[in-house]
Amino acid sequence: MKVVILNGSPRKGGNTEIMAETFAKAADKHEVEILNIAPMNIKGCLECKYCYAHQGECVQKDDMSKVLEILKDADMVVFASPIYWFDITAQLKTVIDRLYACGSTGFHFNKTALLLNAGADHVFDAAIAQYKAMTSYLKWEDKGIITAPNMVEKGTMKECPELEKVKELAKNL
């Protein structure tokens, strides 16, 4: 199975990257690719429907075409993000919005998971609700949601008990 992890964190070596890399290592029976989307040039969806008239091709010529090219062969997508202000990062949300282009052609992948971390323990609800609405509407199989609260400092994920849950999720695919 090909698994693509969309890392929405702009922070190199941060807690989200640690979660993503841990997942990738534990999913050693599968082909796993981590896409660090923050440094990519990806603009917001214009909802112009150009993609619907052109087999999923977007009118915007940016790095999203690279993301879509990689996702076309994926069997599973893992959305990984820190929570900065009650939701996933703007970078990851922009990629999710641009998946609109796949609405005309369909998605190859049908399995997903969500990895979240935050500096507090009460900020995950909006991101989880959005993810559940998306997976339900698109009939994607949710393989798991892992939240790691109180990750205030960079690197604290290394000592977080939820990291074991990340490993278990990846091993049990």
Locations of the language-model features?
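N-terminal beta1-alpha1-beta2 submodule of the flavodoxin-like/Rossmannoid cofactor-binding fold
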Residues: 1-81, 86-102, 155-173
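Amphipathic, positively biased hydrophobic alpha-helical segments used for protein targeting
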Residues: 19, 98, 129-130, 150
